[in-house]
From Swiss-Prot:
Binding site for S-adenosyl-L-methionine 2: 103-104, 162, 174, 199
Ranges for domain Radical SAM core: 40-274
Xref: Pfam families: HemN_C, Radical_SAM
Name of this protein: Radical S-adenosyl methionine domain-containing protein 1, mitochondrial
Transit peptide: 1-39
Misc: Might carry two S-adenosyl-L-methionine binding sites with only one binding to the iron-sulfur cluster.
Biological source species: Danio rerio (Zebrafish)
UniProt subcellular location: Mitochondrion
Keyword Amino-acid biosynthesis set for record: no
Cofactor(s) recorded in Swiss-Prot or TrEMBL: [4Fe-4S] cluster
Gene assigned in the entry: rsad1
């Protein structure tokens, strides 16, 4: 199998993973593996969604609402109430990390962040060393609040730089300048040295490989120890999608996009960054502990309008993990939380084969892949060699040096990571065929 046969589909924006999780589900260490409650069943991470933005970027179709006259006190009370309700429902005793995303959570009051964290500590154990991340829009207003956010309990920032090119920022509809971005990163590094991540996008309209490499080199002069790369995604219905569809703008093709991605990997590696996941790079071991929890299949609780969660509702007598989606519209969500403690719009019980699919989809994103020990926690009845070892399709992927199955486990090669979205359907089909041969269907 050659790279020409495979269609390049790189990782899109981080938030889009949540859309995928809502259909595939997430991993739960089931009682099939042990009669005892495993450690992951009593701990989880927490995602808190702030839905408001000052404006909508031209490429964004995520769940966000233009800030008007939202009541910060009401939002704070509801975020606290839903956090308490879902913590009690999950019965987790330890929160391993907290991530405030959006929307633009740097628009929230620092007192709101402090209040949510206080609720967490009252209802579970949150270590003083736990990672607490806040996404920041690098505007002067966002920069001015950084210190107050650290006083509220934030110890890691994720800065949405997106580009260091003024024309690209304008095309993307961003409300910050290159100078604003650089100043915000610098201030964040002073407050949280070694714990500042920068988001940057590639495959932008009119962007060349040389322009992209120049931006990366400029970024390396100012960034901290974590960088996330995101390929521009043209989402139907967005302003940017319409501009490209009409021919007013053009984006790089697949081959150029692939070169951009490989260029980034090379440039970052030469600067001491280790690629630990498809789109994430860290040096000095500054990985995102919160995101590692997602990729390793740990439980997580989603709070706020449109947030997604994956946990076992032990408080309701549940024994299987559920995929949960909170109500999208902030006003409706607020009313639901005020009336019944939570605004959960959808609950889906996740079955065994769905869980194994999630182990593969999320685990193969990581450079470390899936170890035999990790797989056994979810599938004690069939190990990786039994499921994939005799498959001609898997052997072809191994022969093409895209996939590795050995005594360590199952993982992608460097080329395989680049083409992950293209080879995943083959891997998932083999998983389904194996379990169907044993009489296990996807919804059992």
């Amino acid at each position: 199998m050659s790279t020409r046969v495979l269609t390049l589909t790189l990782l899109k924006k981080r938030h889009l993973m949540q859309c995928f999780w809502s259909t595939v589900g997430s991993v739960h260490l089931r009682s099939i593996a042990s009669d005892k409650i495993p450690s992951h069943a009593v701990e989880a991470s927490l995602y808190v969604h702030w839905p408001y933005c000052l404006k909508r970027c031209s490429y964004c179709n995520f769940n966000k609402y233009i800030s008007r006259s939202e009541n910060h006190d009401t939002m704070t009370e509801c975020l606290q109430k839903e956090t308490e309700t879902l913590l009690k429902l999950s019965q987790v005793s330890r929160i391993t990390s907290v991530f405030f995303g959006g929307g633009t959570p740097s628009l929230a009051q620092p007192s709101t962040i402090a209040a949510v964290l206080e609720t967490v500590t009252k209802n579970s154990n949150l270590s003083d060393l736990a990672e607490v991340t806040l996404e920041v829009n690098p505007t002067p207003a966002g920069k001015a609040r950084l210190k107050d956010f650290t006083l509220a309990g934030v110890n890691r920032f994720s800065i949405g730089v997106q580009s260091l090119n003024a024309d690209h920022l304008r095309i993307l509809g961003r409300d910050h300048s290159v100078q604003h971005a650089l100043q915000t990163v610098s201030e964040a590094r002073k407050l949280c040295p070694g714990r500042v991540s920068v988001d940057i996008m590639f495959a932008l309209p009119g962007q060349s490989v040389s322009c992209w490499q120049k931006q990366l080199e400029e970024l390396l002069y100012v960034c901290d120890d974590h960088i996330s790369l995101y390929q521009l995604t043209l989402e139907r219905g967005t302003q940017l999608f319409k501009q490209v569809e009409s021919g007013k703008l053009s984006v790089p093709g697949d081959e150029v996009t692939a070169i951009m991605y490989k260029t980034a990997c090379r440039v970052l590696e030469e600067s001491g960054f280790h690629q630990y996941e498809v789109s994430n790079f860290a040096r000095n071991n500054a990985v995102s502990e919160h995101n590692m929890g997602y990729w390793r299949g740990h439980q997580y609780i989603g709070v706020g309008p449109g947030a997604h969660g994956r946990f076992v509702p032990h408080g309701d007598g549940g024994v299987q993990r559920e995929a949960r989606t909170q109500t999208l519209e902030p006003d409706v969500w607020i009313k639901e939380v005020q009336s019944r403690g939570r605004g959960t719009r959808r609950r889906i019980t996740l079955h065994h084969l769905q869980l194994l699919e999630e182990v593969l989809v999320m685990g193969l994103r990581m450079n470390e892949g899936i170890t035999h020990q990790h797989w056994e926690l979810f599938s004690p009845e069939a190990n990786l060699q039994q499921v994939f070892g005799k498959s001609a399709n898997i052997q072809e992927l191994q022969g093409g040096r895209f996939l590795i199955l050995d005594d360590r486990g199952l993982r992608c090669s460097w080329e395989g990571l680049v083409l992950l979205d293209s080879i995943l359907p083959t891997i998932l089909l083999e998983l389904e065929m194996f379990f169907h041969s044993r009489g296990i269907k996807r919804t059992q």
